Amino acid sequence: MKNGIAFRTIGEEFDGFLLIKESTRGTTSNGKPFLTLILRDASGEIEAKLWDATKDDEETLIPEQIIQVTGEINQFRGKHQLKILSIRLSQPMDNVQVTDFLGKAPMEKEELAEKLTEAIFEMENPKIQRLVRAFIKKYQEELLTYPAATKNHHEFASGLAYHVVSMLAIGKELHKLYPEINRDLLYAGIILHDIGKIKELSGVVSTTYTLEGKMLGHIPMMVEEIGLMANELQIEGEEVLILKHLVLSHHGKAEWGSPTPPLVREAELLHLIDLIDAKMNMLGRALEKIQPGEFTERLFAMDNRAFYKPNFEENEG
């Protein structure tokens, strides 16, 4: 979707339909109300400001509403911003629907499901295999449709499964290089590590954090679920403990959200693979939006760095 909002350049005019992802009220220094809107289409999202917002604007311009907007692409603090000139809610005769504005994984759900099944069939430890299969059966529909996050990486439909399948591909190659790695543990950790996000996140459209997600987080919720599922399946043994540890430690550090650091080899590798895939997804989509010789917008999740796309890439591929 090269003509989408994410690919527009500074100074370019915009006239089209967008979906409201977030709407936040603010007040200027002289007391005038305004709205900060996060607007999106299938290509990505952009921040927009609606100055002198009315009470009616606050009540109608809410998440999951489709709007027709005209404006101009500006830059603010290193990021693109849409200056709104006119705005209205979509009407039935506009023939647009919410699903038109959702980004999606580059793989279809059927292929993602097939890749997950292949990984489970490769497992040799019956306890680990039964646990993982039970979770896939319980959450298959959500796993294949949910995003992996609200922003930064894999924040699109089927992003959660695509993140997992991409990590499995990395894990498979690393197992060839380091055959001493316990493949069952690594694959299980990859598949299970973010399933807690199904309870942490609200869904595919205008994804936000649920109350459980805000209060507990996906890591503690998933650790608890592993224990409950093991009891239900009457599975005992060290495998259950290590799987809990893999989930608990996959963010790597306490300041990144893990109560304990990785203390087994497969846990360390899971953390690194997770980091690689998340960062490559962020960078890939940011670099896709620019031309060779240009810098990306500053990426908050990448230490607020702007990345350069080399000129010689223009003549490659």
UniProtKB/Swiss-Prot annotation:
EC number: 3.1.-.-
Keyword Transferase among record annotations: no
Keyword set includes Hydrolase: yes
Stored SUPFAM superfamilies: HD-domain/PDEase-like, Nucleic acid-binding proteins
DNA-binding region in chain numbering: 17-90
PROSITE patterns (UniProt xref): HD
Keywords from the named record: DNA-binding, Exonuclease, Hydrolase, Nuclease
GO MF annotations, alphabetized: 3'-5'-RNA exonuclease activity; DNA binding
One Pfam family this sequence matches: HD
All copies of domain HD, residue ranges: 163-279
Enzyme class, spelled out: hydrolase
GO biological process assignments: rRNA 3'-end processing
Xref: PANTHER family: 3'-5' EXORIBONUCLEASE YHAM (PTHR37294:SF1)
NCBIfam families (UniProt xref): PRK13480.1 (NF010007)
Function summary: Shows a 3'-5' exoribonuclease activity.
Similarity-based family: Belongs to the YhaM family.
Protein name, per record: 3'-5' exoribonuclease YhaM
Upper classification of the organism: Bacteria, Bacillati, Bacillota, Bacilli, Bacillales
